[in-house]
């Protein structure tokens, strides 16, 4: 996904072609929202299982062999930082999980998208509720978490969703592995504000306070452009890039 094209003679792509029977190569330099890309991916290709990986993830040799449970809807790996080899995700009931486990219906889990495996059974359950898996009001940060927030919504309707944690991956986590750029700080701020608006906690005051803190920090950094972006997000309840893309799709 843009903004720059990739070469089909790329060495990694050629290695994949030599290893697997079929490797598709799709790219879009329009820099579509990640949520839209994910949702379009599972709509276009009909398979039993779907895996998502970031380009800064190291996949271990035994990763796929840990994904053998046919009764699950979602499988998540333990995510360790490339820098310090510590586990940071998944978080089950706000505690980092560091071992393989089958989750209870009452457990609330969040994790990053890399290494995520979803099945066609999960997609069918979302389709039955006329919901997309990933919230397209998010564009970058927050896209992966939106899946788990939506799973929680389905569970409140007594819809059974089986989730396991199995295997592990090493991933470059920007907040752990180095200083964040202005771009990433802005994107994380958008994520916080959007989440407090779209998936608020029961304590309304806490939601408003969290948004206010983000705005104050943005002002303290003298980031007037960032403040303008956040004001736009609060008004339209979506990421600017998501709004732009969804409007184009609506009228095309």
Locate predicted features.
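Acidic donor-binding segment of Leloir-type glycosyltransferases
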Residues: 1-29
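Glycine-rich, basic loop-to-helix element that forms the pyrophosphate-binding segment
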Residues: 28-45
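Short beta-strand-to-loop acidic/aromatic patch adjacent to the donor-nucleotide binding site
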Residues: 48-58
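Conserved donor-nucleotide/metal-binding helix-loop-beta segment in metal-dependent transferases, i.e.
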Residues: 63-76
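Short beta-strand-to-loop element that shapes/binds the nucleotide-sugar donor at the catalytic cleft/hinge
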Residues: 75-92
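A recurrent flexible, glycine/aromatic-enriched loop bordering the glycosyltransferase active site
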Residues: 99-118, 139-140
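A short, conserved alpha-helix in the catalytic core of glycosyltransferases
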Residues: 122-127, 136-165
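Catalytic core of nucleotide-sugar-dependent glycosyltransferases
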Residues: 169, 179-206, 227-245, 249-251
């Amino acid at each position: 996904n843009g903004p720059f094209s990739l070469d089909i003679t790329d060495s990694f792509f050629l290695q994949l072609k030599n290893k697997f029977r079929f490797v598709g190569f799709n790219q879009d330099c329009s820099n579509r929202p990640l949520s839209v890309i994910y949702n379009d991916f599972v709509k276009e290709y009909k398979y039993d299982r779907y895996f998502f990986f970031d380009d800064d993830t190291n996949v271990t040799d035994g990763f796929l062999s840990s994904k053998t449970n046919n009764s699950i809807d979602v499988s998540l790996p333990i995510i360790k930082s490339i820098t310090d080899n510590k586990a940071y995700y998944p978080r089950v009931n706000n505690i980092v999980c560091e071992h393989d486990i089958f989750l209870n219906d009452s457990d609330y889990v969040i994790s990053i998208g890399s290494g995520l495996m979803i099945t066609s059974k999960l997609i069918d359950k979302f389709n039955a509720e006329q919901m997309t898996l990933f919230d397209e009001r998010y564009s970058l940060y927050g896209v992966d978490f939106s899946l788990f927030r939506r799973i929680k919504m389905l569970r409140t309707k007594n819809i059974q969703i089986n989730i396991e944690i199995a295997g592990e991956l090493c991933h470059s986590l920007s907040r752990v592995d180095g200083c964040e750029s202005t771009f990433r700080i802005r994107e994380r701020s958008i994520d916080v504000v959007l989440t407090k608006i779209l998936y608020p906690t029961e304590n309304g005051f806490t939601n408003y306070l969290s948004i206010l803190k983000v705005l104050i920090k943005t002002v303290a950094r003298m980031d007037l452009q960032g403040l303008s972006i956040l004001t736009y997000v609060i008004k339209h309840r979506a990421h600017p890039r998501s709004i732009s893309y969804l409007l184009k799709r609506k009228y095309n």
